[in-house]
């Protein structure tokens, strides 16, 4: 600026003014020098004056720029403040009004009138507090008992940095403070004009825009029901013209609601979600169930209190309700116990969440204190399809939190048994706490408890540290996931002589012929011995040394229990059989044909007067899960004709093993209960079931039977086929199938292939003949790669691996 100002003045100082042309007389005289110097002096004085003002101008300019910057920053900062919608849901109790049935019908004039007044009251209440600045919108969507309860939601538009400050607890406290401040006030308060709101009956919960959208989508099919104490209320089914419905359920104040859901169709795609509040708040979801679940045909769900919501989402269109809902109020069950255990090693009782097998409720807390009789013992907890894992840092347990000896563990649903072993180091006992950390719950939890010897936790067996279970050791099957039960074995799946650790095959033990150097294999054959991997356990819980003593015609147990239930496994007088031969009538009298609409689907075996065993994968499709579809034929030989010895049955019950996993084929076993008992004959009689300790020696030749295809990809056979196969060592088969073979599986076949089961044989029996002449069920046709391919064996469900479940169901 100074240079520019100076340059503009330079011509004035350096360019003297000259009179234009000539004077009046036309003689052209110059101007007087004095005038010129005077003008120049004045110009210099003015320039120096301007120069003195320059700092002031600069200062003013800087002030203007700074002010503009501050204002610009302020306004830009203000505009950058992000406003967010904070959604709340809740309820309030009105003391001077009463609920009526008209308020359950959203289309009624009473509902519309009450809603308008209640919404006005709610808005006035909120805007009377410091929240009024942020008020956006609100809605009262339903009413309930109590004398009158209003259910609502509202939205506050707040700066993002204040979002965490306005938690539901803070908002509720502000509203309660406002209500309390006007209780005894004589001044007119707008929101108290028509409603006397109970401050203690106000509840505020966190919600979301998504929750409100879900709620609004159900209001066209909204049902409110109050169920009284001692009442079981069956709920009206959904409106099939709607895509979604909501049942708003309420019971007496001091009770909790129990909802029962029963699926009525074999197949559907409907979704039901249960909430621990009056509306569909995602953070208060108890559980969701989908599509006519076969695994859970009946579900019972507990709320934490007297309010529950059930939301239905339509799946496939149907003229029939795919489910039945009923609800009842129940009393709170205490979940605390103090127990002193007896001085014995078996299971001594059961602990469970309230109303087991109902889903445990949100806010469940159980505390069990158990005292052991001696420090020689530890406490064992045996779970069914449930395991305990170490809790991850700062993450809640979604399936129940356990606290045991200051250890925090999370529950986890699994398709396996599991045991938790707790060492005891003090006589004070052990306290076990179970807590539902979040609203999302699951099926009720049950655990068997008992003692174990801390110095010898698994007598005669191996303690698997992975799952806490006692498993057979050195039997040729890796029962423990890490395989440690089969390491360091001197004699694997054989008998070890005491004298020199020589190994002899098990069938040579107690056979009357000494094989060990000093005859130790023939010692203690007529007396009880400690129980072990291959010892047979009698009904009196004693064990005998002789392998496979069942039904051999000679009592080995003191109580004779090894010779009981032996009317089985005898042949008459005489989906997958490749390289086989046609069977004769009565040759395999336990063989079953499972048919749907006259078409053979799977094989099976008769194991008791009303029970047939088969593979679970025969029913894995929803369309095959209904018992009414199936007909069971026994004594059948030819598929296209009947003979006098064959009989047919309908199915009254279908039970899949609870641990069955479709992808891995693990626990591939199912039981069918027949609609009436069989009449035994030469053509119809059961096969023998092996004990858990029964040993099927690798290399043993056994037989499979069925109507399966005679070659891979071919049609099923018309005649019942039979073929002999050889039992394969577990390690070899597991290697062939890249370690997908589980301890509940066994393999049979030949390296060269050719003889194998095939499509249509699934569920059919693999039977082995004992020295007594009786046939024992070793396996069920399950899976394999192709049919009769070289270097691939057939894989079968190992009956000894699932025999405990079979006996539990059948007996």
Curated annotation (Swiss-Prot):
Changing residue 510 to S: In IRIDA; reduced HJV-mediated inhibition of HAMP transcription; reduced localization to the cell membrane; loss of catalytic activity; no ability to process HJV. It is linked to Iron-refractory iron deficiency anemia: Key features include congenital hypochromic microcytic anemia, very low mean corpuscular erythrocyte volume, low transferrin saturation, abnormal iron absorption characterized by no hematologic improvement following treatment with oral iron, and abnormal iron utilization characterized by a sluggish, incomplete response to parenteral iron. Belongs to the peptidase S1 family. It is an enzyme of class 3 (hydrolase). Residues 84-209 form the SEA domain. It is found in: Cell membrane. One of its GO terms (biological process) is positive regulation of transcription by RNA polymerase II. It comes from Homo sapiens. Interacts with HJV. One of its GO terms (cellular component) is extracellular space. Residues 457-489, 490-526, 530-567 form the LDL-receptor class A domain. Residues 1-55 are cytoplasmic. Membrane-bound serine protease. Through the cleavage of cell surface hemojuvelin (HJV), a regulator of the expression of the iron absorption-regulating hormone hepicidin/HAMP, plays a role in iron homeostasis. This is Transmembrane protease serine 6.
């Amino acid at each position: 600026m100074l240079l520019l100002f100076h340059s503009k003045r330079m011509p004035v100082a350096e360019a003297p003014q000259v009179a234009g042309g000539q004077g009046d007389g036309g003689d052209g005289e110059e101007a007087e020098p004095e005038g010129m110097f005077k003008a120049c002096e004045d110009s210099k004085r003015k320039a120096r004056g301007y120069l003195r003002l320059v700092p002031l101008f600069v200062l003013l300019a800087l002030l203007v720029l700074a002010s503009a910057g501050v204002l610009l920053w302020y306004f830009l900062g203000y505009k950058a403040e992000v406003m967010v919608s904070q959604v709340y849901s809740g309820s309030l109790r009105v003391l001077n009004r009463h609920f009526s049935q008209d308020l359950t019908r959203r289309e009624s004039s009473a509902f519309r009138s009450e809603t308008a007044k209640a919404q006005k009251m709610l808005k006035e209440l909120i805007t009377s507090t410091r929240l009024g600045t942020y008020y956006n919108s609100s809605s009262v969507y339903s009413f309930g008992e109590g004398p009158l309860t209003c259910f609502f939601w509202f939205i506050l538009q707040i700066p993002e940095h204040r979002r965490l400050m306005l938690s539901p607890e803070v908002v509720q406290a502000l509203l309660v403070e406002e209500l309390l401040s006007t209780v005894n006030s004589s001044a007119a308060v707008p929101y108290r004009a028509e409603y006397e709101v109970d401050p203690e009956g106000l509840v505020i919960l966190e919600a979301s825009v998504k929750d409100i959208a879900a709620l609004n989508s159900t209001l066209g099919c909204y049902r409110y029901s109050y169920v009284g104490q001692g009442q079981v209320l069956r709920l009206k089914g959904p409106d099939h013209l709607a895509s979604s419905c909501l049942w708003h359920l309420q019971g007496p104040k001091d009770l909790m609601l129990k909802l029962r859901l029963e699926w009525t169709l074999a197949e559907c795609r409907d979704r039901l979600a249960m909430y621990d509040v009056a509306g569909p708040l995602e953070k208060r979801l108890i559980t969701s169930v989908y599509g006519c679940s076969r695994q859970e045909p009946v579900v019972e769900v507990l709320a934490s209190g007297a309010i529950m919501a059930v939301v239905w989402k339509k799946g496939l269109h149907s003229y029939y309700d795919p489910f039945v809902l009923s609800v009842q109020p129940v009393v709170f069950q205490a979940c605390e116990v103090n127990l002193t255990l007896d001085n014995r090693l078996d299971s001594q009782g059961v602990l469970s969440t309230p109303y087991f097998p109902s889903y445990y409720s949100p806010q469940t807390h159980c505390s069990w204190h158990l005292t052991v009789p001696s420090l020689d013992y530890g406490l064992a907890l045996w779970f069914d399809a449930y395991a305990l894992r170490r809790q991850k840092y700062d993450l809640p347990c979604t399936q129940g939190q356990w606290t045991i000896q200051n250890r925090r563990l999370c529950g986890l649903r699994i398709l396996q048994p599991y045991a938790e072993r707790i060492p005891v180091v003090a006589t004070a006992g052990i306290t076990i706490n179970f807590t539902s950390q979040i609203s999302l719950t699951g099926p009720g939890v049950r655990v068997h408890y008992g003692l174990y010897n801390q110095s010898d936790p698994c007598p005669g067996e191996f303690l698997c540290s992975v799952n806490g279970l006692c498993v057979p050791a050195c039997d040729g099957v890796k029962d423990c996931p890490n395989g440690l039960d089969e390491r360091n074995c001197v004699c694997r799946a054989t008998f070890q002589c005491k004298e020199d650790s020589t190994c002899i095959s098990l069938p040579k033990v107690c056979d009357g012929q000494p094989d060990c150097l000093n005859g130790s294999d023939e010692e203690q054959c007529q007396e009880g011995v400690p129980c072990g991997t291959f010892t047979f356990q009698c009904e009196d819980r004693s064990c005998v040394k002789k392998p496979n003593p069942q039904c051999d015609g000679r009592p080995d147990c003191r109580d004779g229990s090894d010779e009981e239930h032996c009317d089985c496994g005898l042949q008459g007088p005489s989906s997958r059989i490749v390289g086989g031969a046609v069977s004769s009538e009565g040759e395999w009298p336990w063989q079953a044909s499972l048919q749907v609409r006259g078409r053979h689907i799977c094989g099976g075996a008769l194991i008791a007067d009303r029970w047939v065993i088969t593979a679970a994968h025969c029913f894995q499709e929803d369309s095959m899960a209904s018992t009414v579809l199936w007909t069971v034929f026994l004594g059948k030989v030819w598929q296209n004709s009947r003979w006098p010895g064959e009989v047919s049955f309908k199915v009254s019950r279908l039970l899949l093993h609870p641990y069955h996993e479709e992808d891995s084929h693990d626990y591939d076993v199912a039981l069918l209960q027949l609609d009436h008992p069989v009449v035994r004959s030469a053509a119809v009689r059961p096969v023998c079931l092996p004990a858990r300790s029964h040993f099927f020696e690798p290399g043993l030749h056994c037989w499979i039977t069925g109507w399966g295809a005679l070659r891979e990809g071919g049609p099923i056979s018309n005649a019942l086929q039979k073929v002999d196969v050889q039992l394969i060592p577990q390690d070899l088969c597991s290697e062939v199938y890249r370690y997908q073979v589980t301890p509940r599986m066994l393999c049979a076949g030949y390296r060269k292939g050719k003889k194998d089961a095939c499509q249509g044989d699934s569920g059919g029996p693999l039977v082995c003949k004992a020295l007594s002449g009786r046939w024992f069920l070793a396996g069920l046709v399950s899976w394999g790669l192709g049919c009769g391919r070289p270097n691939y064996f057939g894989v079968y469900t190992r009956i000894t691996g699932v025999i405990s479940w079979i006996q539990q169901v059948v007996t």
